[in-house]
Amino acid sequence: MRMYDLIEKKKLGCALTAEEIDWMIAGYTAGEIPDYQMAAFLMAVCFQSMDVSETTAMTLAMARSGEIADLSGIRGIKVDKHSTGGVGDKTTLVAAPMAAACGIPVAKMSGRGLGFTGGTVDKLESIPGYRTALPREEFFQIVNEIGISLIGQSGQLAAADKKIYALRDVTATVDSLPLIASSIMSKKIAAGADAILLDVKAGSGAFMKDREQAAALAERMVGIGEQAGRKTVALITNMDVPLGETAGNAIEVAEAIRTLRGEGPQDLTELCIHLAGNMLYLAERGSLADCLKMAEHSLTDGSAYQKFYQMVERQGGDVRYLEDLSRFPTAPAYPVLAAQDGYLAAMQTEEIGATAALLGAGREKKEDHIDPAAGIRFLKKTGDAVRQGEPIAMLYTHLPEKVEEAQRRYQGAVRIAEQQPNREPLLYARVSAEGITPL
């Protein structure tokens, strides 16, 4: 087999066999296929695409290229949840304890964040003492004893994906649907869960800017999951507006805790009920309607908060921070003022996320330091009435030299109009093996 022939085959729009894809991924991971040939192949995929069988073969080959987590030591059906990311997306901190409170095991390995704010692991490390690196035996033991553990993921999962993503990043081949789908799903399959729930964001703060793109990605990933023997469901959700009331790290953890107590914002609460409900459905706990009711009940009866509390305590976190949210670190606050009277008509969510990163809440490079106290509180969101000079957001930072630029960027990222805009739904659709159901 020669890499030249596989590049030529894909250039002509022909489908590769699973054997050819396995050979290519193994060879590239081992350093036997040079970057320039893999880059040529990736560009051919951008122009000619891949069908579901090819994408599944590529996903499985990448999953097998590194360590595959064996979760058989954890009792019950394990459901993994993945979000394609956005601004204010603290859903794992809420939906995972909700699902665990309803009796399903949640063994979740999450990443650190590159970009707007920290990932789930960075957010959890805002709680002093919380251990995100656990030996496998302890991770399993905690899940078997209390039903949930959230830790950092091994760098050894889907080794080929890491290498291929770095190449895509510098060769303008990031935005290919089969390459995006195989990258996400290779890590999910390597993480060892029995079923997978995907939260595919659509909008100005999402990787997929419109619903049609998001639906195509969701359908492809569900197809891969099902072909790989994992029951898979995707929700297509709105990221034209930041989720919840905050973007940052400690500030998002505090908001997640309030939500677990039943005191959170309506959009975050509603989305987490749907995410936890679908996790329960995938774990075969009942009909979807019953599972959604169970998820909602875990917030009203306090069991979801108790489950989060148990997990933090068990993993060495200081639970006094959960009992008294004012303990979380804070930074000096600076308001962003409305430039005129009217209604907040639109938010450029990606630019708002970039503003949070400018304040110190995110990182551009792996080694960058995140300030847990930095972030943004959204006082007004799309559809809200505003008065000139009224604060529409609060910026929190220890970098006073960045404030003026951050205020200017935030003001430039929102549009105020005379007419109140129509409110877009939070959830657009649910995608399963049976097809797309509008929500």
Predicted features by range, described:
Residues 5, 10, 15-18, 28, ...:
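Well-ordered secondary-structure scaffolds
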Residues 47, 93-107, 187-192, 227-228, ...:
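Alpha-helix C-terminal capping segments
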Residues 49-110, 114:
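Active-site cofactor/substrate anionic-group-binding motifs, chiefly glycine-
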Residues 123-149, 219-225, 229:
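A glycine-rich helix N-cap at a beta->alpha junction
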Residues 1, 10-73:
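N-terminal glycine-rich anion-binding loops that anchor highly charged ligand groups
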Residues 87-95, 100-101, 108-109, 115-118, ...:
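Short glycine/serine/threonine-rich phosphate/pyrophosphate-binding segments
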